[in-house]
Amino acid sequence: MQMLDRLESEILADRVSEESRRWLASCGLTVEQMKNQMDPVYTPARKIHLYHCDHRGLPLALISTEGATAWCAEYDEWGNLLSDENPHHLQQLIRLPGQQYDEESGLYYNRHRYYDPLLGRYITQDPIGLKGGWNFYQYPLNPVINVDPQGLVDINLYPESDLIHSVADEINIPGVFTIGGHGTPTSIESATRSIMTAKDLAYLIKFDGNYKDGMTVWLFSCNTGKGQNSFAS
């Protein structure tokens, strides 16, 4: 049986070994005779479909090259499938940016961890620890606007969807510990829009691997220096 399985694989790959040919010859058979006895392998015709996504990148429909809707679905804010129409039995596993539906678990694989849309949370902790904020399992608090393509958050506190996030990434001042984020006179926002106090931010700075005791800290954030006893002070 093992020999037949191997022979079948070799014939399908069109790479029959000399050993297999000798074995067939000893049985009075040829490769062509065996090939004619095998059931044809069904290979579906390849078809191109174009994605139609919402403003977050969540696929809502697959459009054929003829302009027909081959698949469509409706989701809630957290990515839960509410309904779908799939007359051609297409396999569409892509969800929110960076996510792929796992049929076995019902969860969404998000590169570094799994996201549960029913809970609106990750099921494992953020692998970058406190740099992602206090809540290790949190998904963006406003999923209508924000996404988390990698399942990670950077020390750069500007959301990745904001243009200023990439600008802040370019700030590199030797010997200075720099922080960027949206702020107010009394607080600063994390990358997931949660509010952080001065004490919260100080804790993150202290445990950041790039921070050394005595370093100058520069805060690139609007409004955090306004008024007396401001957040920046």
From Swiss-Prot:
Disulfide bonds: none annotated. Belongs to the RHS family. Transmembrane segments: none annotated. It holds the Pfam family RHS. InterPro entries: RHS, Rhs_assc_core, T6SS_VgrG/RHS. It comes from Escherichia coli (strain K12). This is Putative uncharacterized protein YibJ. It comes from the Bacteria.
